[in-house]
Amino acid sequence: MPSAHSVKLRPLEREDLRYVHQLDNNASVMRYWFEEPYEAFVELSDLYDKHIHDQSERRFVVECDGEKAGLVELVEINHVHRRAEFQIIISPEYQGKGLATRAAKLAMDYGFTVLNLYKLYLIVDKENEKAIHIYRKLGFSVEGELMHEFFINGQYRNAIRMCIFQHQYLAEHKTPGQTLLKPTAQ
């Protein structure tokens, strides 16, 4: 697993859009994302411009030893209800090395301690066993199953909604006197 010092999050910048575009257009990366792979770069640029000051989302680039290794996003941030949707993509060459767990913890620390969110939730394909295993390891629990939620490759797919609450996360990952890891983008 990458060391604590080799993994960090930083805010998504315009210069990162080519990297994001490569991830978005990789069918193996996007197969569990319930979205069509393949979007035009101009569409991605327009989305970036439209949402650059949107307070309902925080998007981070995951870096491992200074190299771009994935994306972590807190989207649909609702400050009244103190919740957000958690999303993560790790580049194929960095998968299986514990990076998703490290990056997720950094984003969760940010969500629960900086944004003071009460709840993080996610939607995952029921058949994505690797992701579900990682999410359970991080403390997420199943809230329910969404039947025939997404139409992908000619068939409907079920999804699982999972969540974790601030008090659960802090009890598991913060001890008295310990400083939580923070993304560099505070």
Swiss-Prot record:
Q: How is its activity regulated?
A: Heat shock, alkaline shift, ethanol treatment and poor nutrient availability produce increased concentrations of monoacetylated spermidine. Inhibited by alkaline phosphatase, N(1),N(8)-bis(ethyl)spermidine (BESPD) and N(1),N(12)-bis(ethyl)spermidine (BESPM).
Which EC number applies?
2.3.1.57
What is this enzyme's catalytic activity, as reactions?
Answer: an alkane-alpha,omega-diamine + acetyl-CoA = an N-acetylalkane-alpha,omega-diamine + CoA + H(+); spermidine + acetyl-CoA = N(1)-acetylspermidine + CoA + H(+); spermidine + acetyl-CoA = N(8)-acetylspermidine + CoA + H(+); spermine + acetyl-CoA = N(1)-acetylspermine + CoA + H(+)
Look up the domain of life of the source: Bacteria
Give all residue intervals belonging to the N-acetyltransferase domain: 7-167
The catalytic site is made up of: Y135 (proton donor)
- For binding spermine, which residues are annotated in this chain's numbering? M30, E35, E43, H51, I52, H53, D54, E85, F86, Q87
Question: Which parts of the chain are coiled coil?
Answer: none
Q: What happens when the gene is disrupted?
A: Cells lacking this gene accumulate spermidine at late stationary phase and show a reduced cell viability due to a decrease in protein biosynthesis. At 37 degrees Celsius, growth of mutant is normal in the presence of 0.5 or 1 mM spermidine. However, following a shift to 7 degrees Celsius, the addition of 0.5 or 1 mM spermidine results in inhibition of cellular growth or cell lysis, respectively.
Binding residue positions for Mg(2+): E35, E76
Could be important for selectivity toward long polyamines, annotated site positions: E85
InterPro entries reported for this sequence: Acyl_CoA_acyltransferase (IPR016181), GNAT_dom (IPR000182)
Q: What else is known?
A: Acetylation neutralizes the charge of the polyamine, which is then typically excreted from the cell.
Record text on subunit structure and interactions: Homododecamer. Ligand-free SpeG forms closed symmetric dodecamers in the crystal and open asymmetric dodecamers in solution. In the absence of ligand, also exists in solution as hexamers and tetramers, but not dimers. Can interact with the DNA-binding carboxyl domain of RcsB in the presence or absence of spermidine.
Family that this chain belongs to: Belongs to the acetyltransferase family.
Instruction: Please describe what this protein does.
Output: Involved in the protection against polyamine toxicity by regulating their concentration. Catalyzes the transfer of an acetyl group from acetyl coenzyme A (AcCoA) to the primary amino groups of spermidine to yield N(1)- and N(8)-acetylspermidine. It can also use spermine, but not putrescine.
Name of the protein: Spermidine N(1)-acetyltransferase
Query: Which organism does this sequence originate in?
Result: Escherichia coli (strain K12)
